[in-house]
Amino acid sequence: MPLIKFKPTSPGRRSAARVVTPNIHKGSPHAALLEPQSKTGGRNHHGRITVRHIGGGCKQRYRVIDFKRDKEAIPARVERIEYDPNRTAHIALLCYVDGERCYIIAPKGLKEGDKIISGPNVPIKLGNSLPLRNIPVGTTVHAVELKPSKGAQMARSAGSSVQLVAREGVYATLRLRSGEMRRVLAECRATIGEVGNEEHNLRKLGKAGAKRWLGVRPTVRGAAMNPVDHPHGGGEAKSGQGNPHPVTPWGVPTKGYKTRKNKRTQQFIIRGRRG
């Protein structure tokens, strides 16, 4: 997919760069697979901000994605590839031979008219979903489950993929794009191929307003605030943070501070992403 730039008719257009997607469906999404989605502004039921930098944005409807791919041994045809405002990847609308339709994450190279299928013994073909125990070692996959029948949780964003590097007993070893080596149960499902829209990271929004359309509010430095608002705040002129190490607005160390506390799943990580 080519990357295009615009005539510099304004500062925002001068800096913008967009990925051309000629094969994306231009019409409306499939109405039966849409759900309403309300904005929270990053606030909980008490009205307090729990997630910063969220607010505004265009109205969106959620596309119901089939992450389980548990409709086995029934062939499906790709009706079209669509844009999804809720994720970086594109989605594909499938039509099964029994008439049912569903959305899946669109892998790279999948196009309108292709036939795909799910099941334990289906061919190793782009878009097919099957357990890791039946996938050859060395295959690139995406939409990987962490628990059998729970639904895909890994490698779902644009351009992401996972490589199956080994299989031993009831576990399969995966190499993530971050470099992490992780074991998952071989009964977990995965989809053949890598996620499409791999040039998503090359786009440039061009202006702050484009970020606001996405529902993202500005990020303000703590050192630019008052002492009442942030531990880094206050001081004369452009003072530093004044702390031995940088902290969050709630005093928790940040910028390199390790926050992973889940020891239960640590046993499944053979090598961390930091080596």
Curated annotation (Swiss-Prot):
One of its GO terms (molecular function) is rRNA binding. It comes from the Bacteria. Keywords: Ribonucleoprotein, Ribosomal protein, RNA-binding, rRNA-binding. SMART domains: Ribosomal_L2, Ribosomal_L2_C. Gene3D superfamilies: 2.30.30.30, Nucleic acid-binding proteins, Ribosomal protein L2, domain 3. GO terms for cellular component: large ribosomal subunit. InterPro entries: NA-bd_OB-fold (IPR012340), Rib_uL2_dom2 (IPR014722), Ribosomal_uL2 (IPR002171), Ribosomal_uL2_bac/org-type (IPR005880), Ribosomal_uL2_C (IPR022669), Ribosomal_uL2_CS (IPR022671), Ribosomal_uL2_dom3 (IPR014726), Ribosomal_uL2_RNA-bd_dom (IPR022666). PROSITE patterns: RIBOSOMAL_L2 (PS00467). One of its GO terms (biological process) is cytoplasmic translation. Belongs to the universal ribosomal protein uL2 family. Part of the 50S ribosomal subunit. Forms a bridge to the 30S subunit in the 70S ribosome. One of the primary rRNA binding proteins. Required for association of the 30S and 50S subunits to form the 70S ribosome, for tRNA binding and peptide bond formation. It has been suggested to have peptidyltransferase activity; this is somewhat controversial. Makes several contacts with the 16S rRNA in the 70S ribosome. This is Large ribosomal subunit protein uL2. It comes from Xylella fastidiosa (strain 9a5c). The lineage of its organism: Bacteria, Pseudomonadati, Pseudomonadota, Gammaproteobacteria, Lysobacterales.
